[in-house]
A protein has these predicted regions:
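Secreted, disulfide-rich extracellular signaling modules
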Residues: 1-312
Length: 312
């Protein structure tokens, strides 16, 4: 193929999609950065117009001077994302979307290998800033170890539309770039037969794994307070909603049935479905409810425990 020696004078088709990256006055490559949110399913209206804003968590928390991932309290649903990013300077991009992307043909969407996604392409300024660090560190063996300091994390906020929930299962950053071809051992630039610098297409992918924490911030409307204040009944709303406490009269049962032998005890809690609703889509009643002893509730979720029939 055609080799490009001058990063400032690339082909028009490349120039439209790639940003020139400079280290000082020297051009070191052309770069494009895309961030994907992959989801396997959704809840609600497939065609409701929604919008998300994506921010880099590049702000260190006041008092500790550390990024969010060093804060042990940052992994709970009451996390305050505002402590770790700036609304004006940390914006990576915004994207309008629907759960079912009609711009993708039916033949593609119906493939068993197709996974829907929402994509954000970083603008020129952000690409220059992040691309410079990645291109400079890209030739080192420990790039992935350094990545956390180069890009501490991202925060995605749903700021328009409330008719759809995406069940995101993976986040991926793809960095595609043109750079000088270099000797794999010496690191020296390779040249063409005409003596010009050789340029190659290359890329890096940074994909979330189990070790990459996905913390969810959930906020409830003011109407939830009406449910909390009711005295004739209680509600269950999870996660980050209403957590009802049930007190079991163990002492009273013991005093009354202390001399009896019980093989099994059944706990029954009657539930009532909402009779009417103005919502087009409603979640079905859960098939089971998790009961956890109060003193064990924090450890249960922190340690990813399963119900054992004793503590939960």
């Amino acid at each position: 193929g055609k080799m490009i020696a001058d990063f400032n004078n690339v082909e028009e088709s490349v120039h439209k999609n790639y940003t020139t990256i400079k280290d000082g006055e020297t051009s070191i490559g052309n770069c494009q950065i895309n961030i994907y949110l992959w989801y396997d399913s959704y809840f609600g209206d497939s065609l409701t117009a929604c919008r998300l804003s994506m921010y880099e968590l590049d702000k260190k928390k006041e008092g500790t001077n550390e990024y969010w991932y060093k804060d042990p309290n940052a992994y709970y649903t009451n996390i305050d994302p505002d402590l770790y990013y700036d609304k004006e300077t940390s914006l990576l991009g915004r994207k309008s979307y629907t759960a079912v992307d009609l711009s993708v043909s039916d033949s593609i969407r119906n493939l068993s290998t197709y996974t829907p996604y929402v994509k954000i392409t970083l603008d020129k300024a952000r690409t220059e800033e992040l691309g410079k660090e990645l291109l400079k560190e890209g030739r080192t063996k420990d790039l992935y170890k350094k990545f956390q300091d180069i890009f501490p994390g991202l925060y995605v906020e749903s700021d328009y539309g409330d008719g759809t929930i995406l069940y995101v299962n993976a986040v991926q950053m793809d960095v595609a770039f043109l750079e000088h071809a270099r000797d794999s051992i010496t690191g020296a630039k390779l040249r063409t037969s005409l003596g010009k610098d050789s340029v190659v297409y290359a890329g890096r992918s940074f994909t979330s794994t189990r070790e990459v924490i996905q913390a969810n911030k959930l906020e409830n409307g003011t109407k939830i307070e009406e449910c909390i204040d009711r005295k004739d009944c209680t509600y269950l709303k999870s996660p980050a909603g209403i957590f009802t406490e049930v007190t079991l009269p163990i002492e009273e049962i013991s005093n009354t049935l202390g001399s009896d032998t019980l093989n099994a005890v059944k706990l029954s809690i009657p539930i009532y479905n909402e009779a009417t609703s103005d919502k087009k889509f409603g979640m079905s009643v859960p098939r089971s409810v998790l009961l956890i002893r109060k003193k064990y509730k924090d450890d249960f979720f922190k340690n990813n425990e399963l119900s054992d029939g004793i503590k939960s």
